[in-house]
């Protein structure tokens, strides 16, 4: 199924059969599971997934591709024409069990889609996503890592993250200017460290990484008091990239009811 890629959708279609087979092996779909594919494109991954699953739901934004996919794979494939950001995963999850999610996400909207899916982690079994390698570098970065940032902390707060393998630009048409990585995310059950207020945790983490060279004392001024740093056991002279997820949770919880936190919200 040939289709001219649209730049405004950030379309890069997967064409390499060897890469597709590696992805299917990593996903290991089993008949009877409920799986959602985001951005099926030309159906390169859809076809082998359907061979394993029998049925599949896909969401496709491109209104030219959506009906062609439906026609090609009917009745086994259900295509939802629209934006993945407008989709509620809870509505697609089975009554018993959870939803599995697979996707080759457009680089220009990959982070918003990722956070949208993480917000529904309670109904998601796992996610297998093809993303820009630079994004995955940040997702898997450990404390002290050069690429550690807000994305690292918030993704690792919610999930166990594993890079499955890297994918060369030549596996796509048109070939992007960057490498890609295939990544597996498995939501924690239960969370190793649960924040009292997850929106507040995200606010603290975002502020902490607002100035890469700043100490936490400076980047969190007005949000976190000296007393909160002490209560959390966090050095205010440290930099954000050195903190673990657990340390951020302790810090956010300690600051949550402090006067400085209330003033900064």
Swiss-Prot record:
**Which keywords belong to this entry?**
Cytoplasm, Methyltransferase, RNA-binding, rRNA processing, S-adenosyl-L-methionine, Transferase
List the subcellular locations. Cytoplasm
Kindly state one GO CC term assigned in the UniProt record.
cytosol
Where do the annotations place S-adenosyl-L-methionine binding?
12, 14, 39, 60, 83, 104
* Alphabetical list of CDD domains matching this protein: AdoMet_MTases (cd02440)
Task: List all disulphide bridges recorded for this chain.
Answer: none
Catalysis performed (reactions) = adenosine(1518)/adenosine(1519) in 16S rRNA + 4 S-adenosyl-L-methionine = N(6)-dimethyladenosine(1518)/N(6)-dimethyladenosine(1519) in 16S rRNA + 4 S-adenosyl-L-homocysteine + 4 H(+)
Which InterPro entries does UniProt cross-reference here? KsgA/Erm, rRNA_Ade_diMease-like_C, rRNA_Ade_Mease_Trfase_CS, rRNA_Ade_methylase_Trfase_N, rRNA_adenine_dimethylase, SAM-dependent_MTases_sf
Q: What class of enzyme is it?
A: transferase
Report the Gene3D superfamilies cross-referenced here: Ribosomal RNA adenine dimethylase-like, domain 2, Vaccinia Virus protein VP39
Molecular function via GO: 16S rRNA (adenine(1518)-N(6)/adenine(1519)-N(6))-dimethyltransferase activity; RNA binding
Source species, domain of life? Bacteria
Q: What is its EC number?
A: 2.1.1.182
* PROSITE patterns associated with the record: RRNA_A_DIMETH, SAM_RNA_A_N6_MT
Pfam families recorded: RrnaAD
HAMAP family to which the protein is assigned, alphabetical: 16SrRNA_methyltr_A (MF_00607)
**Membership in a protein family:** Belongs to the class I-like SAM-binding methyltransferase superfamily. rRNA adenine N(6)-methyltransferase family. RsmA subfamily.
Function, please? Specifically dimethylates two adjacent adenosines (A1518 and A1519) in the loop of a conserved hairpin near the 3'-end of 16S rRNA in the 30S particle. May play a critical role in biogenesis of 30S subunits.
Q: What protein name applies here? A: Ribosomal RNA small subunit methyltransferase A
């Amino acid at each position: 199924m040939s289709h001219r890629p649209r730049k405004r959708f950030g379309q890069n279609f997967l064409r390499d059969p060897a890469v597709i087979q590696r992805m299917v092996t990593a996903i290991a779909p089993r008949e009877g599971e409920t799986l959602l594919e985001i951005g099926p494109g030309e159906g390169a991954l859809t076809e082998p997934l359907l061979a394993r699953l029998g049925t599949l739901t896909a969401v496709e934004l491109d209104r030219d591709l959506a009906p062609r996919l439906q026609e090609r794979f009917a009745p086994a494939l259900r295509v939802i024409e629209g934006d993945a950001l407008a989709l509620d995963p809870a509505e697609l999850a089975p009554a018993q069990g959870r939803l599995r999610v697979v996707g080759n996400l457009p680089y220009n909207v990959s982070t918003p889609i990722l956070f949208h899916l993480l917000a529904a982690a309670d109904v998601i079994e796992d996610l297998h996503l093809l993303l820009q390698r630079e994004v995955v570098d940040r997702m898997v970065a450990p404390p002290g890592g050069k690429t550690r940032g807000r994305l690292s902390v918030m993704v690792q707060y919610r999930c166990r993250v594993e890079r499955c393998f890297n994918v060369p630009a030549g596996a796509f048409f048109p070939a992007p200017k960057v490498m890609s990585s295939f990544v597996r995310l498995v939501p924690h059950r239960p969370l190793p460290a649960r924040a009292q207020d997850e929106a507040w945790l995200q606010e603290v983490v975002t502020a902490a990484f607002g100035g890469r060279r700043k100490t936490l004392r400076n980047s969190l001024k007005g949000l976190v008091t000296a007393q909160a740093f002490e209560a959390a056991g966090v050095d205010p002279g440290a930099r954000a990239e050195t903190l673990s997820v657990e340390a951020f949770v302790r810090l956010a919880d300690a600051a949550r009811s402090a006067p400085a936190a209330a003033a900064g919200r």
